């Protein structure tokens, strides 16, 4: 009897276990999905010269669909810094899309001095290609000087080049560097014709849709609007009064005050398109036109649209971070972003695209503005001629100094020919520079280990140094100082005003929220790579922002 009961119990237990396993097998999800989950489209947006604090300085005046939507529906890495110096446009776009730094990707400035060629080299110059879409030389450009791959290149390779990559900006470098080496099309603005152009690196002729877009002659239509403030000028309480003496005037204007009259430039001076906030509207209209024309997000593979908005940089340089012009530009940009996001929702579908927005660098306050009891000033550029005289008097050699990107470059051939002591010339140069107003320090770039400066600054200089392209001595300016003789302002320093940038992600795969952990510009490409399940770019040193992953 006991044996019989035991057998019955075991049978019941076995059947129950088997049924449970069957039920479990039915509901157990597959560990490995049948296809790789990816968004239909990735949109990368770079706002040229956007300081991080602009997110919040104008927050109360933004609508709900632009910057506020990014902050409230997306993820914000609030403490994202640039890990190198100099902080310039070409360096920023390269580092965002490569996950790298100038030391590795080779883009150490907008220009740099090439000792072998004996001249300055422009970051995307390429005399081996031709302009497409114009008879000008504005299209003699390509990404050949970029020494590593971009996240856009890696996406193309990951899909055996089925994914499409389209890149657009008013600035050539703002379109070319994000697009990488393998973009299907990179388009930038030609000042001579008022049209978007490209180069034979990408194509032999412009697509029909680009010709149709150019045929609208939108710059002339924007010029007809002139530039008045979007709201009554007295409501611009986040800015200084209009028309400050340290602001630059537009060509032909007697004052820097509103309104700015652009009708005079129609059919004459197309370069002015970049200097008005409508330059951003113009670029985004082109980006919107590219989506249906190139069937972006409809190819069955993840496509990539890279958009860099340049007018914020032109306005910032001319008027400075505290101007009404700058505030008005960002209020207009906020409306443009809302329109663009709504267009993406309609054409690609909300939740079907991944979007990130960041900046290539920030900006220092105008030196004239800082005269109001704050440290800062203008470093006069006569340093170069003074140095030349000093070294000649001491060593009887003309070093033919070049000062670019805060770096001093010597003519080493002239030094060798004169049999002068290179080390002593370098030290004399450093001794002279550290005595100048506005210079915090001057350091031997090739001997950074012996330099007594904070490690954070040292790391940024090292990350910006490329052995084949960089100079001999790096000049570190005092906070708030900028090397210029003209009104307006600039950027290039290690300081937070130049290196603290927004980093916002929204849409597919992104968990809404924010973090104040320290991240870097070079972390953006690895994060996008992780979301797309593709290899990081070949020179990437960044890390994934795991806080935003769903």
Curated annotation (Swiss-Prot):
Tell me the membrane topology, using the record's own terms: Lipid-anchor; Peripheral membrane protein
Which residues belong to the signal peptide in this entry?
A: 1-20
EC class name: hydrolase
* Cellular-component GO terms for this entry: Gram-negative-bacterium-type cell wall; plasma membrane; side of membrane
Per UniProt, the cofactor note for this protein states: Binds 2 Zn(2+) ions.
Keyword Metal-binding annotated: yes
Record's protein name: Alkaline phosphatase PhoV
